[in-house]
Amino acid sequence: MASSNGLSLQEIADLVGGQLLDFSDCINDETNSSDGAVQGKSPSVEISSTICTGAAPPAEAGPQQITLIDQANHAGQLADSQAFAVIAPEYVAASPIRLQILVDDPHAAFTKLVSHYRPALGETMPVSGIDPTAKVDPTCQVHPSANIGANVEIGPGCTIAPGVNIGAGCQIGADCTLHPNVTLYAYCQLGERVTLHAGTVVGAHGFGYKMVDGRHIPTAQLGYVVIENDVEVGASSTIDRGTYGATRIGEGTKIDNQVMIAHNCQIGRHNLLCSQVGIAGSCTTGDYVVLAGQVGLKDHIALADGVIVGAQAGVMDDLAPNQVYLGSPATPQRDQMQIMAVQRKLPEMRRELKRLTQRIGRLSEALEEQSADIDQRKAA
């Protein structure tokens, strides 16, 4: 997400209390100092003065933006990133990005930087009415009780129903319908022909906490939500904003009532998510995925294209393409049907096991008695 609040690389380093170094000469050298440590150099004035237009996660950062890596062994995340600089806790040798700002706490530094580029995030809801800086197409129908925040842009043909709240910086494409009491937090983006049913909340704070002195302290949730064209979201569903970048709902996806999608999730195109589905943070789904009612997904897993997951399944691992999965933990349909067939026989199997155990007990007693008789005869 680009910003007009551009900073030079040196200004960013000063803002976050880091050291800006250029490691371009270290690409082919594991070390370049007498003590074996890799030594970057201070970049030229020209490079230090380069303006950075925004901050985003590696996969989202553009060529004039800066990104983040919290551990050197996560360098693979930077392989396809377009960012021209990275904030890191130490020199990242495997990084293709050679301009690095080294800091003690990358997340704290990145939080400060993202807050600079998106300062209105805390001003999520307008006080009342339509902010004078908002741009609402004259063909829109906006109920008088709706609230529209600063710098919001709403395209032609949209319908904004009673009680809708649209936070600062949101962008809404043509022919969208927001039913009563829908809430969009700051910087959310809707494509064209998006329908959000009553009570839906888009862009709320992600469920992220860290333990500090025995207390759960909220972590920064400074991202936003992108909902692409022709998406429909049912009543009272919730889609949390990303930590730094976007939680994304792909084109044509249909989401039922009371569905929960957590921060950083990337939902593919033309998915069907049925009622009470719960998707934990940083999950990815491919295209044409179907999740039946009350399916739950563990965080940081990926479902490939064409996956179908049956009702009430619990998904704990990545799922292969074009397969049907059932049960908890979710397993391929054929395997789960065999498990279910055995489960139905468990009461009968338990009774049979009890009978066999009793029979073995009687046989064991008889053998012991027979053995004792043989011993007595031998003794006589």
Swiss-Prot record:
Its EC number is 2.3.1.191. The active site is at H263 (proton acceptor). InterPro entries: Hexapep (IPR001451), Hexapep_transf_CS (IPR018357), LpxD (IPR007691), Trimer_LpxA-like_sf (IPR011004), UDP_GlcNAc_AcTrfase_non-rep (IPR020573). Signal peptide: none annotated. GO terms for biological process: lipid A biosynthetic process. Pfam families: Hexapep, LpxD. Pathway: Bacterial outer membrane biogenesis; LPS lipid A biosynthesis. It comes from the Bacteria. One of its GO terms (cellular component) is membrane. Homotrimer. PANTHER family: UDP-3-O-ACYLGLUCOSAMINE N-ACYLTRANSFERASE, UDP-3-O-ACYLGLUCOSAMINE N-ACYLTRANSFERASE 1, MITOCHONDRIAL-RELATED. NCBIfam families: lipid_A_lpxD, PRK00892.1. This is UDP-3-O-acylglucosamine N-acyltransferase. It comes from Rhodopirellula baltica (strain DSM 10527 / NCIMB 13988 / SH1).
